[in-house]
Regions:
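Residues that cap or initiate secondary-structure elements
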Residues: 13-15, 77, 114
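Short, well-ordered beta-strand segments in beta-rich or mixed alpha/beta enzyme
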Residues: 4-11, 50-86
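Short, conserved, surface-exposed binding loops centered on an aromatic residue
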Residues: 1, 29-30, 60
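Short amphipathic alpha-helices in soluble, non-transmembrane regions
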Residues: 20-26, 82-90
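Glycine-rich beta-strand-turn "strand-cap" elements at beta-sheet edges
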Residues: 37-62, 88-117
């Protein structure tokens, strides 16, 4: 069964073009190292909920937009191998303080699908 990494971040609207460049660089690298799919989505209908919501989860500010992304792998074992290669890839070595989003507010995790259609 496949394995999925999911990510949610808040990106300043003024930095969206920079983030898109980063995503367009990172995606092919993930795929080159063995990911089956790499998807980045920009929030279109993500209201700020009273108790829970995507914007609340990442403490999105008024000038930020929510990005929801996921990467699909063949298995957890494949994900671990792909992730090790991605993290070691010199093309993604960056200064985290210069990223176009606040990584401290990123939420992420690995998931085992239980329904795939």
């Amino acid at each position: 069964m496949s394995y999925v990494d999911g990510f949610v971040i808040a990106v300043p609207k003024a930095s969206l073009d920079d983030y898109k460049k980063l995503a367009n660089t990172a995606g092919p690298i993930w795929m080159e190292h063995g990911a089956l799919s790499y998807v980045e989505c920009i929030g279109d209908d993500v209201p700020y909920g009273e108790l829970t919501s995507f914007p609340r989860a990442v403490q999105a500010k008024d000038d930020e937009i929510v990005i929801f992304a996921w990467v699909v792998y063949e298995s957890r074992q494949s994900r671990d191998a792909v992730m090790a290669k991605v993290m070691a890839d010199a093309r993604l070595k960056m200064d985290w303080s210069a990223m176009p989003f606040d990584g401290k507010r990123m939420i992420f995790g690995g998931f085992q699908p239980f329904v795939e259609l």
